Amino acid sequence: MTALRLLVSDSHDPLFNLAVEECIFRQMDPNQRVLFLWRNANTVVIGRAQNPWKECNTRRMEEDGVTLARRSSGGGAVFHDLSNSCFIFMAGKPGYDKSISTAIALDALKLLGVSAFASGRNDLLVATQDGDRKVSGSAYRETHDRGFHHGTLLLDADLSRLANYLNPDPKKLAAKGISSVRSRVANLCELLPGIEHQQVSHALIEAFFAHYGARVSPEHISPTQLPDLPGFADTFARQRSWEWNFGHAPAFTHQLDERFDWGGVELHFDVEKGVIGRAQIFSDSLDPAPLDALAQRLVGVAYRSDAIAALFGQLKADFPARQAELDALAGWLQAALR
């Protein structure tokens, strides 16, 4: 078995790539040093301990067809599209050292003609006339015998889209989760006009080989060309599941309010593991009975617009005289919780 392994994904599906990453990390020989390269189509990737409703504008993501994906490592929320290059270094202990992988990434940038440096928050920065700006962010994961360093390099990303999806709606979320630190970012194309993913990948590969003094042939991965990955189907199913991407969120509370022509409504949700544990509805409506019934039925329901919308069919059957009001309430909730 060679000491180095190079894998390149030909898929742009973020859920596929994260599942491959997880399988490789769990099954790699701890004596190997692995570099895995890929790109994702429109995606917001959140850290293992983050709350997607707090970090992301989930409504706009759904409208624009942007995928939400939770990774197994820590760190903050990032937006990926095909103008981002993703890399991951994996190694067994005691050889794993994130300062080594950081040095390889910096060497790759140097090969491209970019002088960058590492910051205290695990980012790679470049000095510009507008101050220091981030061109790469990183996240890390360690087990008892191995570790990995996951990073992205911004090539020509639409930074306005990044800001749109990572800035949540102006709703108050009193969360126990971790908020991302928003950083000033820069595209490499500002420094290297015309830079492409293939050039960045080549530089990362050359820096990886140079550091370890050896070369290996790349293994190309796609949904139709998988390496030997026992258990991949189960890992992929978990990575695609709502329970992992949304339900794994830390406990949080969410408050919503709206005024209708029949009265004002204020809702308080306590949510844990993506399920509503407690719901309170306050209103000056002249007939609060349907709202009381809704509050009771919300308990134990997944914090998803479709799951909550499904409650209204029976509510309208139980309160036929209030169908118009319940339709208005259902429409508002579906829009507010997307």
Swiss-Prot record:
* Gene name as annotated: lplA
A GO cellular-component term linked to this record: cytosol
Q: Where does (R)-lipoate bind?
A: 134
State whether it acts alone or in a complex, and with which partners, per the record: Monomer.
Domain BPL/LPL catalytic stretches: 29-216
Q: What is its EC number?
A: 6.3.1.20
Query: Where the protein is mainly located, per its record?
Result: cytoplasm
Official protein name in the record: Lipoate-protein ligase A
Give the note. In the transfer reaction, the free carboxyl group of lipoic acid is attached via an amide linkage to the epsilon-amino group of a specific lysine residue of lipoyl domains of lipoate-dependent enzymes.
Q: In which pathway does it act?
A: Protein modification; protein lipoylation via exogenous pathway; protein N(6)-(lipoyl)lysine from lipoate: step 1/2; Protein modification; protein lipoylation via exogenous pathway; protein N(6)-(lipoyl)lysine from lipoate: step 2/2
